[in-house]
From Swiss-Prot:
PANTHER family: STEROID 17-ALPHA-HYDROXYLASE/17,20 LYASE, STEROID 17-ALPHA-HYDROXYLASE_17,20 LYASE. A cytochrome P450 monooxygenase involved in corticoid and androgen biosynthesis. Catalyzes 17-alpha hydroxylation of C21 steroids, which is common for both pathways. A second oxidative step, required only for androgen synthesis, involves an acyl-carbon cleavage. Hydroxylates pregnenolone to form 17-alpha pregnenolone, followed by the cleavage of the C17-C20 bond to form dehydroepiandrosterone (DHEA). Has 17-alpha hydroxylase activity toward progesterone. The 17-alpha hydroxy intermediates, as part of adrenal glucocorticoids biosynthesis pathway, are precursors of cortisol. It is an enzyme of class 1 (oxidoreductase). GO terms for biological process: glucocorticoid biosynthetic process; hormone biosynthetic process; progesterone metabolic process; steroid metabolic process. It comes from the Eukaryota. CDD domains: CYP17A1. It comes from Papio hamadryas ursinus (Chacma baboon). Keywords: Endoplasmic reticulum, Heme, Iron, Lipid metabolism, Lyase, Membrane, Metal-binding, Microsome, Monooxygenase, Oxidoreductase, Steroidogenesis. Heme binds at residue 442. Its cofactor is heme. Disulfide bonds: none annotated. This is Steroid 17-alpha-hydroxylase/17,20 lyase. It is found in: Endoplasmic reticulum membrane; Microsome membrane. Its EC number is 1.14.14.19, 1.14.14.32.
Amino acid sequence: MWELVALLLLTLAYLFWPKRRCPGAKYPKSLLSLPLVGSLPFLPRHGHMHNNFFKLQKKYGPIYSVRMGTKTTVIVGHHQLAKEVLIKKGKDFSGRPQVTTLDILSNNRKGIAFADYGAHWQLHRRLAMATFALFKDGDQKLEKIICQEISTLCDMLATHNGQTIDISFPVFVAITNVISLICFNISYKNGDPELKIVHNYNEGIIDSLGKESLVDLFPWLKVFPNKTLEKLKRHVKTRNDLLTKIFENYKEKFRSDSITNMLDVLMQAKMNSDNGNAGPDQDSELLSDNHILTTIGDIFGAGVETTTSVVKWIVAFLLHNPQVKKKLYEGIDQNVGFSRTPTISDRNRLLLLEATIREVLRIRPVAPMLIPHKANVDSSIGEFAVDKGTHVIINLWALHHNEKEWHQPDQFMPERFLNPAGTQLISPSLSYLPFGAGPRSCIGEILARQELFLIMAWLLQRFDLEVPDDGQLPSLEGNPKVVFLIDSFKVKIKVRQAWREAQAEGST
């Protein structure tokens, strides 16, 4: 009896103990690890994971490994090593690990964000980038679309003059409409029931993915009942059903001679492939309806909640730092005034606002840990060997809070991105990658930067953003899920007197 138990344990240890492909190679230091459970018993159980990994650097250095269940994961916490992974050896490390929850979200690894490296991912990323090229100028210029939605946002907020509100949903609506126009030329009216559906499934997906799920570490557990997985599946189905409805309706309107949005680009690519008019890398099997819908879903998922969250973080930090907010108002008044609305060209004049956005992206990165990468081949990071199939996580929090790179990294200091005279934007450190880098960098970076600048410039021009009368300031602790969320808070919205007077003069 005991001999059989011992034999079973030895067999499990052999199967699940980390194996080195190159016995003589030098590997990163590793946390203690046990068969089956890996390093889990030795990881801190309290606090945010990104911060815990950052603290472990003091003992293990800027690169080390942990055993997450049965998989080896290398944690990278220095900008030079991170750029080696993302840029210098970007192709080596451009794979994506297979993760149960993300497989559900991506309809079995389709789309862009969570798809593994290969022909499918390359094709869909290229087509998505081609879509953004449609919005460079003319009536479809990205800035024009963004400003149209911000104008509607500001008009809605003005109806709450003097009130204390949560700006989350109004900002969500504006950004959803920008993404929706880019994807399929649809802009939702306030009160449209589909908006609520999008908002609900979006929140449900983020909440489900934010729960630490053992099934991601031990995939065999998915055979057992799992409330989190079932909830995720329900919300993904709701998303897929809505996108399918939009897609089916749009098929009747599609014209190959009028390509104006992402759905047009993807459908044209599919048509060309079906007709034999595409290159060898454009296989029609990679452009099925399911592939197309997942890519659209990726753009929605990546483009809405991220920017909405950053806008809220910016407002929260301004409520905590009224002296910065005061200077921002002065900059708006002096450089833009009230006879026109802010434009992207004002970036060159509203330097403190741009610096504030950069500082918020540093101190509260959208994703404190970038989506995990996977080694496609046997490779190396720095002096250390990394075997094919190894997972690699860039701890962006560590890069953005390194005391050797940033003066008082836990302090909100927008001026760090300005020269001493405040007349020029600077890069104070190379340890700054808010949108990632390399082959897997955020394809919506230009869109996000424009949205953040324009939304904040318009809000500051029109409204006083004040702490509620009860003095309740937002918590800056945050809740790191797929996106680093800020806890719900309220802000007192007041139409600025100078704006009101300028509008009165203009109407006479």
